[in-house]
From Swiss-Prot:
GO-annotated biological processes: glycogen biosynthetic process
Catalytic activity reported: [(1->4)-alpha-D-glucosyl](n) + ADP-alpha-D-glucose = [(1->4)-alpha-D-glucosyl](n+1) + ADP + H(+)
Binding locations of ADP-alpha-D-glucose: K16
Gene it is expressed from: glgA
NCBIfam families: glgA, PRK00654.1-1
EC number, as in UniProt: 2.4.1.21
Pfam family, one: Glyco_transf_5
Lineage start: Bacteria, Bacillati, Bacillota, Clostridia, Lachnospirales
InterPro entries the record matches: Glyco_trans_1, GS/SS, Starch_synth_cat_dom
Family: Belongs to the glycosyltransferase 1 family. Bacterial/plant glycogen synthase subfamily.
The protein's name in its UniProt record: Glycogen synthase
Function field: Synthesizes alpha-1,4-glucan chains using ADP-glucose.
Domain of life: Bacteria
Length: 478
């Protein structure tokens, strides 16, 4: 039996700002319980809904030194969906109405969390063989584990894994301040350890000190060794390539299931989608005030509205995208210029464009169920979960071939009758427009082929089961 402690800054259902929460909250329940005891540790934010906080059981508390301060550490426990979750409590750091704030506050907050998490292990009654860290917020854990805690008998032989969900976010701050906060001596702040370009870099520390480094798709693991995707750490990724691998994320097939989903008006499955799926489209058209027409080609886009997601390409050809025979439904928030751009087109083509500048889990499910195609022209995408949800709901993804999108969407080949979606290679607006028009042509003029693409997409398995098997192999190799 291998004991694994997965440490992250967020996990569903307690707190979620991005895909990391889905991984930390969903993945652990899919491991083989006879061979792996996987538990999760996150901060006990005061913004976690009360319905969860009131069920947490107090375990213990103690004090740790953080630089020149002594800080309280409370430890709470809760079992959820058969998985044990631990929560590190300290209202000074984890108070407030959102999990993250300004970077200078987060730098200290997650230095505290890293040290507190390791300090809590002996009092949990659970000794992990492997500590699985996620993103820069836990980047100091492998550093502290090797340099500060390894002398203790309890900690000897514990291995660490660092998973990178998005290399863009690295936890970078002033070297002198980080020395003060972490209490680590000068020799750790050299260019082969925590220092990068005259600053301290938490993620770099994690990558250097961890026994294994993973990222969330095989293609992204290769891409981050190149300067374009490497975010100034490509040299380090090449140096660590012998321990670097990629494992694609999954989605929770219980949560995202068109057959049982209570958030959508009409349930359907891989057999009945031809007769039932269009009813969701008409219901959404009615709700959003679009022209009601079950045959109209509807494209969905659920995303953070930022450059990374390829929205500059969309902005460049938006007039052509919103042709007479298309409806375009957008959901998300982000950069003001993109929010306003979509609002403008909603006003200009109000019968065929709907801009919903907010985020709602309910609305996202309705969009996945109603649309014919789903657009994801990302500049880079470590894994991406939206295309997996689209495939699950029989909505055909149109993606750029990068990172996880390339690994999970097989491009349609009309000659071989293969493929689960449409893709384009170069980051170019007209190339994207060309592939959208190609998809539209197949939809309108080759409906049987289109339905076969939907059918193949709904048959693919991107549940957490397949990811969990690969993580089990990784854990066994340590």
């Amino acid at each position: 039996m291998k004991n694994v402690l997965l440490i992250a800054s967020e996990a569903v259902p307690f707190i979620k700002t991005g895909g990391l929460a889905d991984v930390a909250g969903s993945l652990p329940k899919y491991f083989d319980k006879t061979k792996f005891d996987v538990r999760v540790m996150i901060p006990k934010y005061t913004c976690i809904p009360w319905e969860y906080r009131e069920k947490m059981v107090y375990k213990t508390h103690f004090y740790i030194d953080l630089a020149w301060r002594t800080q309280y550490v409370g430890v709470f426990e809760l079992e959820w969906n058969g998985v044990t979750f631990y929560f590190i409590d300290n209202e000074f750091y984890f108070g407030g109405n959102k999990p993250y704030s300004w970077i200078h506050e987060d730098i200290e907050k997650f230095a505290f969390f890293s040290k507190a998490a390791l300090s809590a292990l002996p009092v949990l009654g659970f000794r992990p063989d492997i500590i699985h860290c996620n993103d820069w917020q836990t980047g100091l854990i492998p550093v502290y584990l090797k340099e500060r805690f390894s002398q203790g008998e309890f900690y000897q032989g514990i291995k660490s894994i660092m998973t990178i969900h998005n290399l863009k976010f690295q936890g970078i701050w002033d070297l002198k301040k980080v020395k003060d906060i972490t209490g680590l001596p000068d020799e750790y702040f050299t260019s082969d350890k925590l220092e990068a370009y005259d600053d301290a870099n938490y993620l770099k520390g994690g990558i250097v000190y961890a026994d294994r480094v993973t990222t969330v798709s095989e293609t992204y693991a290769e891409e981050i060794k190149t300067p374009f995707y490497g975010e100034n750490l490509d040299g380090l990724m090449r140096a660590r390539s012998n321990v670097l691998s990629g494992i694609v994320n999954g989605i929770d097939y219980d949560e995202y299931n068109p057959e049982t989903d209570k958030r959508i008006p009409n349930n359907y499955n891989q057999v009945t989608f031809r007769k039932e799926k269009w009813k969701n489209k008409v219901a959404l058209q009615k709700e959003l005030g679009l022209t009601e027409d079950k045959g109209k080609f509807m494209i969905g886009l659920v995303s953070r509205l930022t450059d990374q997601k390829g929205l500059d390409l969309v902005a460049y050809v938006m007039d052509q995208l919103c042709a007479e025979d298309v409806q375009f439904v957008v959901l998300g928030t982000g950069e003001e210029r993109y929010e306003n751009m979509f609002r403008h087109y909603d006003w200009k083509y109000n019968d065929r464009v709907s801009a919903n500048i907010y985020y709602s889990e309910d609305m996202s499910h309705k969009i996945y169920a109603a649309c014919d195609a789903f657009l994801m022209p990302s500049l880079f995408e470590p894994c991406g979960l939206s295309q997996l949800m689209s495939l699950r709901y029989g909505t055909v993804p149109i993606v750029r071939e990068t990172g996880g999108l390339k690994d999970t969407v097989e491009p349609y080949n009309e000659y071989e009758g293969k493929g689960t979606g449409f893709s384009f290679a170069n980051y170019n607006a007209h190339e994207m427009l060309g592939i959208v028009n190609y998809a539209k042509d197949v939809y309108y003029n080759h409906k049987r082929e289109w339905n076969k693409i939907v059918d193949r997409g709904m048959k693919t398995d991107f549940s957490w089961n397949s990811s969990a098997r690969k993580y089990e192999e990784l854990y066994n190799s340590l």
